[in-house]
Amino acid sequence: MHNIHRRHFLKAAGAVTAGLVTANIALNANASSVAPKPSSGKSVIGLIAPKMEVVRVGFIGVGERGFSHVEQFCHLEGVELKAICDTHQAVVDRAVEHIVKQKRPKPAVYTGNDLSYRELLNRDDIDIVIISTPWEWHAPMAIDTMESGKHAFVEVPLALTVEECWQIIDTAERTQKNCMMMENVNYGREELMVLNMVRQGLFGELLHGEAAYIHELRWQMKEINHKTGSWRTYWHTKRNGNLYPTHGLGPVSQYMNINRGDRFDYLTSMSSPALGRALYAKREFPADHERNQLKYINGDMSTSLIKTVKGRTIMVQHDTTTPRPYSRHNLIQGTNGVFAGFPNRIAVENDGFGTSYHKWDTDMQKWYDKYDHPLWQRIGKEAEINGGHGGMDFVMLWRMVYCLRNGEALDQDVYDGASWSVVNILSEQSLNNRSNSVNFPDFTRGAWEHAKPLGIVGA
């Protein structure tokens, strides 16, 4: 949803903050020694929905991110774009115009207020809903979607509180509907190749990973009335932690089989001073501008360390403020070698190419030739043509539709979305308690121990 009135944001953010205070107290106990929350339904690990000959799609939010999804779905076979919803008429008109230009039927439109999306959910000719709205709407919209009998596909993060995570999981288990957080980075060419390398044992036993979202986004502060910065800026005044952990953490979690043989155990976190946003506002806005009246509290650099039940470690960082090159780190270290991204480089003992592990090998072509993921081999060229973050967006949506049409389980489930997103909340709880460790809830309720690892799919 392209726009949200500031008063609605402040109300929602205030509720989140209040919830965190309560959660901080509740999670001081050792969660690892507490039995998981009982379920009112059946686990959705490996959930397979009945095959859909055609996937009928509704879109909630067609602004920045949502419009990109509309564009990509227009390139996919076996889908119908049935309805769209947004509070901002201009982006609704743009989406409708684009769909019609692609020679697809004109979708139904729902707009007018923040709850117009419920009219879309009342339709009986929609199978899945793509949710691309401000963060505070993700959980309630996902829950409403599943309650309406539809599968929910949600932009990142999945939720903003531990309780929201549990509510989403409980709803998915009770309704037996998919709720997938659309972590597109898991479908990048490099990430898929590294997953293939890991599954073939190239790095030996895994020990350590590093993940990040380092992306200078101060310029979004100039988006005042519409677009992402019109609402995301305020989160830097409400929270102090890792606001956006999933882009880097998703791939590393899949390398390590998190929730499929291992799981996150506990986390410790700290943040640097919060200086950059205020300095930017002072430089770029008039002294009496609202951006200069805000108190920015989110540390410019957030660093968290995660320990898994199997003893592995993961560093997760967040920085959208300081001037530096983009990075997600994407590092995975095993007993036989290491891969690191940004830029891509690898060092492996006995790598088969006669290269010494004492220095980085940056010639990636031979590695692509040997380990390129079958999924990218099949549709990589089409993905590069259609775009979307280098093609990863197209691959993700293509794979979602393929699974739904062919009766296969999705690659990411609701437990993944909750586990990766909850770093947002736990990092803040740790920071507020002098960086003492905070335990992860076991969102799978113990099922992680027997869940099948994500394989190397060929379609």
Swiss-Prot record:
SUPFAM superfamilies: NAD(P)-binding Rossmann-fold domains. Pfam families: GFO_IDH_MocA, Glyco_hydro_109_C, TAT_signal. Its cofactor is NAD(+). Its EC number is 3.2.1.49. Residues 1-31 form the signal peptide. NAD(+) binds at residues 64-65, 86, 135-138, 155-156, 184, 244. One of its GO terms (molecular function) is alpha-N-acetylgalactosaminidase activity. Binds 1 NAD(+) per subunit. The NAD(+) cannot dissociate. PROSITE patterns: TAT (PS51318). InterPro entries: Gfo/Idh/MocA-like_OxRdtase_N, Gfo/Idh/MocA_oxidrdct_glycsds, Glyco_hydro_109_C, NAD(P)-bd_dom_sf, TAT_signal, TAT_signal_bac_arc. Substrate binds at residues 213, 232, 244-247, 326. Transmembrane segments: none annotated. It catalyses: Cleavage of non-reducing alpha-(1->3)-N-acetylgalactosamine residues from human blood group A and AB mucin glycoproteins, Forssman hapten and blood group A lacto series glycolipids. It comes from the Bacteria. Predicted to be exported by the Tat system. The position of the signal peptide cleavage has not been experimentally proven. Keywords: Glycosidase, Hydrolase, NAD, Signal. Glycosidase that has specific alpha-N-acetylgalactosaminidase activity. Belongs to the Gfo/Idh/MocA family. Glycosyl hydrolase 109 subfamily. NCBIfam families: TAT_signal_seq (TIGR01409). This is Alpha-N-acetylgalactosaminidase. It comes from Shewanella oneidensis (strain ATCC 700550 / JCM 31522 / CIP 106686 / LMG 19005 / NCIMB 14063 / MR-1). The lineage of its organism: Bacteria, Pseudomonadati, Pseudomonadota, Gammaproteobacteria, Alteromonadales. The gene is nagA.
